[in-house]
């Protein structure tokens, strides 16, 4: 299960063109951007695609502003949601007991206070109260410059609750109040919840999470965004569903048309397709051509026919 916990991935890639809709709105803090369906044109589709792919990397706007359609991109950075969930997955694995048997008789709540080090100067401290009979637990996990196996560094104190069913299954909720995540040029504060469930060979994470860019103050909101993962021989099958709000553009709804396949140790998928729906039912379909390129098809008027396409390098 620890392998499953380490490979939860969020992949969002889109390109949309000339979709109707847009406007402003308000929503509960900390999201301060547009809350209506995205208005996408050929002048901003690149930006929306990269922001969606990063799942919260608002620095993508500055990175890609000079780019035009058909340009060769620099190598794609790891999606922020992938980085975050891998960080949390590593922490969740530390909650698992060393052996599955529970006490034969009901026991008192057992306190746990344990610190693990990541070998790179960081640590994660578990301060939990565990029911030794039911496996239910509550408490707090404190990250101090903690490095995940998928990259990134996390800092902050996170209330948690959940159930450990055995050494092979765990349900855990992370309740972010103000946690900082840094990965490469990305520096954000996360607030919201991540519900992580994993068992032998697969599992899923559901994110209701806000990212605030610590440089620009702009925000991204992942709403009921679900990542489902299945381990395969030499690869991982990843499927994503949900809604993402981008600060400057509004939201798109995401669903997986064909699962994204990530070869072991790769940060780029080798195949897969995802569809995004914007205003007035306009759609974009992204299909992975290979580990180096992907194609975006566009249905700008929502008729179900894709009348425009472009191919990019990651």
Predicted regions and their residues:
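Bacterial N-terminal signal peptides that target proteins for export
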Residues: 1-8
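C-terminal motif of bacterial Sec signal peptides marking the signal peptidase cleavage site
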Residues: 14-18
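Bacterial signal peptide processing site
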Residues: 20-24
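Low-complexity, intrinsically disordered segments exposed to solvent
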Residues: 26-314
């Amino acid at each position: 299960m620890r392998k499953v916990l380490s490979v939860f991935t969020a992949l969002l890639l889109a390109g949309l063109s000339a979709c109707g809709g847009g406007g402003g709105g308000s929503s509960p803090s900390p999201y301060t951007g547009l809350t209506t369906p995205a208005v996408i044109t050929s002048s901003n589709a690149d930006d929306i695609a990269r922001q969606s792919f990063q799942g919260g990397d608002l620095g993508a706007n500055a990175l890609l502003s000079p780019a035009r359609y058909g340009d060769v991109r620099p190598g794609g950075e790891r999606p922020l949601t992938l980085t975050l969930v891998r960080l949390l997955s590593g922490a969740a694995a530390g909650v698992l007991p060393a052996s599955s048997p529970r006490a034969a008789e009901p026991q008192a709540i057992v306190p746990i206070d344990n610190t693990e080090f990541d070998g790179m100067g960081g640590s994660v401290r578990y301060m939990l109260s565990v029911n030794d009979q039911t496996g239910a637990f509550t408490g707090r996990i404190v990250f101090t410059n903690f490095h995940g196996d998928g990259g990134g560094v996390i800092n902050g104190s996170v209330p948690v609750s959940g159930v450990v069913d055995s050494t092979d299954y765990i349900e855990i909720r992370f309740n972010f109040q103000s946690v900082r995540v840094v990965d490469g040029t990305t520096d954000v504060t996360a607030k919201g919840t991540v519900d992580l469930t994993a068992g032998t060979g697969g599992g899923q994470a559901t994110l209701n999470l806000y990212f605030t860019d610590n440089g620009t103050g702009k925000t991204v909101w992942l709403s009921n965004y679900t990542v489902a993962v299945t381990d395969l021989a030499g690869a991982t099958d990843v499927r994503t569903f949900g809604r993402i709000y981008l600060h400057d553009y509004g939201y798109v709804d995401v669903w997986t048309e064909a699962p994204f396949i990530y070869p072991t140790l790769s940060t780029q998928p080798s195949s897969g397709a995802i569809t995004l729906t914007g205003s007035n039912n306009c759609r974009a379909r992204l299909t992975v051509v290979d580990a180096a390129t992907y194609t975006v098809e566009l249905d700008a008027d929502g008729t179900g026919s894709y009348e425009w396409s472009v191919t990019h390098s990651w």
